[in-house]
């Protein structure tokens, strides 16, 4: 039997908002190293150094705003719960024998495309929804419960989560590149190039190491999720290693639109247009476009 890592997620409840404070602390420390210690004072030097500082600080602050906007959008947005009294269309068409349907309903993974029922919530489960042990409820198109945002990542906040990864990678890369000269000075033998205090130099060194580590790790995570979006699947669905035909892969363009929306002007902000909310039901996590059985293809694990 495969080891189910998700059953250990209940331990994440104890972390609570501590992780949010840790994220804010890392951002604050990085801000201190980049703005207060290095590129803020460089504005007063004049010449090329000042121009470079203006460019670095402008790019840094823009990415920081987008990062924080995306991050708190994931934190505060309800990922999507099953509406009270929701029932599959099959139950509406066949109003009799409800208890029989419940007894026959699948309680397994997403590979079952029939009626699904959650014994813990005592309610029907829409397609692609899963029960989160941390949140204690079923989440629409659940991807995973993220410790960094202290929230589930589901239908309503998956786009914000992907943008958080995207802007985190860009921001940490910019920070690492901008602090690289200070990192090299840290290991220099002479004292001629050192113009800051040992404490400021140490702060810059630690900030560089933190950001290069986050940039590399987030890059891998971002690439993985781009691959998932391209095939219209989630982390949980990939973990389940389906061998059945996967009907939700409706083409790369449509797959991305079901996450980011059809208006590409909004792809890089954690918002949807009102038009997309109306014409793309997949954004709500209850109704998904699917291909016919003859057109479907197997969903392979990553």
UniProtKB/Swiss-Prot annotation:
| Main location group | membrane
Q: Where is the active site?
A: 146
Q: InterPro entries of this UniProt entry?
A: Palmitoyltrfase_DHHC, PFA4/ZDH16/20/ERF2-like
Localized where? Cell membrane; Cytoplasmic vesicle membrane
- Its domain of life reads Eukaryota
Q: Report whether Transmembrane helix shows up as a keyword of the record.
A: yes
Topological category with respect to the lipid bilayer: Multi-pass membrane protein
Give the GO molecular function terms.
protein-cysteine S-palmitoyltransferase activity
Q: Transferase: present as a keyword of the record?
A: yes
Supply the PROSITE patterns for this chain. DHHC (PS50216)
Q: Name one GO cellular component term.
A: cytoplasmic vesicle membrane
UniProtKB keywords: Acyltransferase, Cell membrane, Cytoplasmic vesicle, Lipoprotein, Membrane, Palmitate, Transferase, Transmembrane, Transmembrane helix
Q: What region holds the DHHC domain?
A: 116-166
Q: Which Enzyme Commission numbers does its entry carry?
A: 2.3.1.225
**Where would you find the membrane-spanning parts of this chain?**
17-37, 56-76, 166-186, 204-224
What's the domain remark here? The DHHC domain is required for palmitoyltransferase activity.
Function comment = Palmitoyl acyltransferase.
**Listed name of the protein:** Probable protein S-acyltransferase 13
In which organism is this protein found?
Arabidopsis thaliana
């Amino acid at each position: 039997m495969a080891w189910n890592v998700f059953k250990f997620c209940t331990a994440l409840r104890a972390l609570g908002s501590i992780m949010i404070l840790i994220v804010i602390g890392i951002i604050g420390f990085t801000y201190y190293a980049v703005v207060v210690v290095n590129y803020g004072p460089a504005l007063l030097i004049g010449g090329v150094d000042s121009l470079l500082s203006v460019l670095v600080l402008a790019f840094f602050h823009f990415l920081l705003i987008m990062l924080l906007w995306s991050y708190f959008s994931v934190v505060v947005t309800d990922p999507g719960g099953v509406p009270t009294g929701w029932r599959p269309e099959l139950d509406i068409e066949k109003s009799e024998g409800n208890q029989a349907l419940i007894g026959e309903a699948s309680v397994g993974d997403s590979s079952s495309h029939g009626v699904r029922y959650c014994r813990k919530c005592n309610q029907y489960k829409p397609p692609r929804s899963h029960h989160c042990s941390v949140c204690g409820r079923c989440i629409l198109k659940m991807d995973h419960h993220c410790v960094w945002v202290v929230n589930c990542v589901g239908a309503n906040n998956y786009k914000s989560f992907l943008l958080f990864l995207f802007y985190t990678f860009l921001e940490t890369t910019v920070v690492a590149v901008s602090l690289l000269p200070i990192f090299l000075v840290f290991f220099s033998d002479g004292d001629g190039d050192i113009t800051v205090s040992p404490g400021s130099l140490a702060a810059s060194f630690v900030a560089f190491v933190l950001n290069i580590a986050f940039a590399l790790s987030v890059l891998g995570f971002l690439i993985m999720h781009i691959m998932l979006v391209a095939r219209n699947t989630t982390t949980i669905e990939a973990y389940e290693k389906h061998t059945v035909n996967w009907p939700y892969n409706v083409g790369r363009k449509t797959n991305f639109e079901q996450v980011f929306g059809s208006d590409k002007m909004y792809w890089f902000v954690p918002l949807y247009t009102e038009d997309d909310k109306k014409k793309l039901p997949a954004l709500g996590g209850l109704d998904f476009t699917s291909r016919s059985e003859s057109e479907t293809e197997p969903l392979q694990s990553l």
